[in-house]
């Protein structure tokens, strides 16, 4: 599709889990990247494809590369 696709999609019999992953150098950037990821999921309607599933779960998350953090520090269910 012209809308592209999410970074990671996991499907089970009844569920579709969609993840948009972003990378940030620090926590300030991570917050901005989370907003970007949420907007991207909504604008591109990730996961809303055929065949439909009973449950669609869409998650935006950001990996913070700061040496003191180095983990997924931001996330949001969309």
Predicted regions and their residues:
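Structural signature of nuclease core domains in nucleic-acid processing machines
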Residues: 1-78
């Amino acid at each position: 599709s012209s809308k592209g696709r999410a970074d990671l999609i996991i499907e089970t019999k009844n569920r579709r889990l969609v993840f948009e992953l972003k990378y940030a150098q620090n926590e300030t950037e991570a917050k901005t990247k989370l907003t970007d990821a949420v907007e991207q999921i909504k604008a591109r309607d990730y996961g809303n494809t055929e065949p439909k599933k009973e449950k669609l779960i869409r998650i935006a998350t950001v990996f913070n590369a700061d040496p003191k953090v180095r983990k997924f520090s931001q996330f949001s269910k969309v």
